[in-house]
Each structure stands twice: as structure tokens, then as C-alpha cells.
Swiss-Prot record:
Annotated compartments: Virion; Host nucleus; Host early endosome; Host Golgi apparatus
UniProt gene name: L2
Post-translational modification note: Highly phosphorylated.
Sequence motif Nuclear localization signal, residues: 1-12, 459-466
Function, as annotated: Minor protein of the capsid that localizes along the inner surface of the virion, within the central cavities beneath the L1 pentamers. Plays a role in capsid stabilization through interaction with the major capsid protein L1. Once the virion enters the host cell, L2 escorts the genomic DNA into the nucleus by promoting escape from the endosomal compartments and traffic through the host Golgi network.
One protein family per Pfam: Late_protein_L2
Cellular component annotations (GO), alphabetically ordered: host cell; host cell endosome; host cell Golgi apparatus; host cell nucleus; viral capsid
Keywords, in A-Z order: Capsid protein, Cytoplasmic inwards viral transport, Disulfide bond, DNA-binding, Host endosome, Host Golgi apparatus, Host nucleus, Host-virus interaction, Late protein, Microtubular inwards viral transport, Phosphoprotein, Viral penetration into host nucleus, Virion, Virus entry into host cell
Family of this protein: Belongs to the papillomaviridae L2 protein family.
InterPro entries: Late_L2
GO biological process entries: microtubule-dependent intracellular transport of viral material towards nucleus; symbiont entry into host cell; viral penetration into host nucleus
Organism, scientific name: Human papillomavirus 42
Disulfide topology: 21-27
Protein name as annotated: Minor capsid protein L2
Quaternary assembly: Interacts with major capsid protein L1. Interacts with E2; this interaction inhibits E2 transcriptional activity but not the DNA replication function E2. Interacts with host GADD45GIP1. Interacts with host HSPA8; this interaction is required for L2 nuclear translocation. Interacts with host importins KPNB2 and KPNB3. Forms a complex with importin alpha2-beta1 heterodimers via interaction with the importin alpha2 adapter. Interacts with host DYNLT1; this interaction is essential for virus intracellular transport during entry.
Amino acid sequence: MPPQRSRRRKRASATQLYQTCKASGTCPPDVIPKVEGTTLADKILQWGSLGVFFGGLGIGTGAGTGGRTGYVPLGTRPPVIAEPGPAVRPPIAVDTVGPSDPSIVSLLEESSVIDAGITVPDITSHGGFNITTSTGGPASTPAILDISPPTNTIRVTTTTSTNPLYIDPFTLQPPLPAEVNGRLLISTPTITPHSYEEIPMDTFVVSTDTTNTFTSTPIPGPRSSARLGLYSRATQQRPVTTSAFLTSPARLVTYDNPAYEGLTEDTLVFEHPSIHTAPDPDFMDIVALHRPMLSSKQGSVRVSRIGQRLSMQTRRGTRFGSRVHFFHDLSPITHSSETIELQPLSASSVSAASNINDGLFDIYVDTSDVNVTNTTSSIPMHGFATPRLSTTSFPTLPSMSTHSANTTIPFSFPATVHVGPDLSVVDHPWDSTPTSVMPQGNFVMVSGWDFILHPSYFWRRRRKPVPYFFADVRVAA
């Protein structure tokens, strides 16, 4: 292995060596002439400059600026620059002071009275007070002085400035109190009238479509119900068979404080130590048990709770865990195997001894304007002498037409009609005879309120799935 050569160290510059070795006198012979400018080249330049002058041409090692006067065209002279001279002060007037002049200078100027030669007019008074003087003893007449109270004049000045860049139609101006001689004067309007025109506004948004909304405040539409996702893939399913899940669910998670179980309708939060064991293995690492909810699933009433496990916790404090759906079925909803015979609500015929509407009577209108053909009924149309019972069989759908209404009643079985008691009906003549068209066939007139529509004629209702709901009518957190 060849030996390693030592690295070459850089020598200090001449300026650095000159600063350290000049005082001690140990400088190399080439350092002092180079720094002080006494080399052979420097001496040749000094000797040559004595005989030749190139200062005006700008020849040298400096920047090519043409010297102090700059570059000028050939055959011309450089411009003359006037140099400023010394400033000249204004002359100061000097007053001579003699020996007889006073040494005290007055700070106030002497005022002189100028007589312009204007005569002073005489002013003659036409009224006033008469002054009486006496030389001896007290005055016999007391002095009467007419003293009138001075007029109390109140002057209030208010200055108001308005910004032309901002005008508010409803600017509240607070009152400006002004107190003069113990009096408080307030006279300022509080609300200034506006100058704009009031235009009634109309509502143009009439739909509740929130997808194509062009305004900032759309009309709120129906709110969709929240989906809990109890049976999703990310939620574990754990059935609970013990009844303590309904009354005291905290006993299935922890042993702490068995005397206080908390409210079963609220969300339960648990704080576990680092090493613990749950009473029920299914409730291991549960840190939160949300509010109960009721639902209908597979023909039974089910009580459900969402639990949150704590599987991992980072140094920052972030917790990770899975969601568990704990449910307990209360009772199955099954159909009874016992068959109960149902009794009909109404009979097929109305008997004469029926007492459903004993206080109601059937009143028939006058049918003198009705064209009746092929009538096999024995119901009287005018006066009634005694109550009668008539039974009529109709093989088809009969109908009756009058000037007031058309009535069609389907009957395919013998009907017994109770005529009612004797009533006198007043006959009112008509101005014109109406024309009625009545189809061929039998008819029957029924008047009463004691009949019920058969259940088979009702519309069938579609069953909707039972949604999930909470015991306290709030969404679980």
C-alpha cells in the first residue's frame, strides 16, 4: 500500500502576513514591497507619469467613464459647470447710541395721537335721570332706583355633519342635551324619515327541490329519517339472552359500583383499567353503550343497543374499535291458532220489530211527477192509511229517477220495507212539468240510516315496514 501524501496547506495572503509580521520584522522579502507598492513595476509607472500626463483622456486602470468631465465629441469643449460660491448674508442696519441716550429700551412701542382735524359733534340727551345734590343734612326725599331685571336669552347651537358616502334611512340620532341657567332643552327627532319607496315582495320559490337551488335560503323540504345501519357488514351481531340487558345493562360490562347503575334510557360510558375482565364475555372492551331502541324484526319485538369497543389506542389518544349490535327479543308476534267465529254486524233484511231507529220516521216525497213503468212494488205513493209491510223481489239492479236526484241501489234478495206511520204530505204544484227519462225496469226506494257497508267494499291498505324508533324519541349518538 503506497504511503499517503500530506495535504498541501494554502499559504496566507500577503496582506494577512503583512499585518502580523510588520511589527516583529519577520516578513518575507516579497511581502513588504507588494503591499507598500515599491516593486519594480510600481516604480516604472511613477517615473513615466512624471513626463507624460494622461489624466484628461481617462486612460488608466479605473472604470471607463471618461474621467471627471466624461466623453465629449472631438473639436468641442466640455461644458462648464458653475460651482456655487459662498452665501452672502443680507446687510444689518446698525444704530449708533450716543452717551446721552437712555440705556433702557422699552418693550412697548410708543403710541402717537394723530389729529386728523375732524370736529366732535355735540350730543344732546332728551331724557335720563335728574340728579339733585344738597349740601346740608340728610336728603328729605329717598332715592328711587328703577332696576329692571335683565332679559334671559338662551341660545343653543347644534352642528350636524352628514357623510355623503353612507346614508342610512333608519339612523338613530341620540338627543343632544343643552343646559343653560338650570334648564334642560331637548328638541331632536329620534328617527329620520326614509326617502325610498316600499314595494311589496312576492315569493317566487314554490318548490321544495333542494338539488336545483339558486338562492341562499331554500325552502326546507321533508327531512329523511336517519339510517342506523344495525345490520350492516361493519357491525357485529350479538344476541343477549339475559334479562339484565333491559333493567341494568351496566352489570354486563363492569363490576364497579353495583349500587348505582345509572339511567337505562341514556348512553352509558365506561372507563376501564388497563387489565380488566367483563362479567359477560360478549361485553369485553365495551367503552360506550348507547340508548336503547325498539324495532320489529322477524315477527318479534326487539330491544337493541349499539356498543363501541376499544381495541387499540395510539400515543396521540386516538381510539379504534368496532361497533357491536346487542339485541334482545322480548316476545314473538304469532297468529293465534284458535278460530273465532265472527257475528254479522247487520242482517240481510230489516224486520218490522226492529228498534234501531225507533225515533226516526220515513218521509217520502211526492212522486206525482215521476213516470213509473213496470212497477211490481206495492208501496203507496200518496197518503198512508195504516202502516204496511211489503216484500218485493228484484232480479236486476233497479233505479228511480225524479226531478231532484237519481238513486240506484243494488238488491238481489227479498227486502222487507217498513212504510212508517200515517203522515199528511202537503202537495205543492210545480210551474212546469219536468221531463224525466226513466229506464225500463223495477225500482225500490229505501230511506233510513240503520245500514252498514260490508267490509269487502273497503279499499285495502298497503302495509308499510315498521321503522326503528327510540324510547326517548331521539337519535342515538
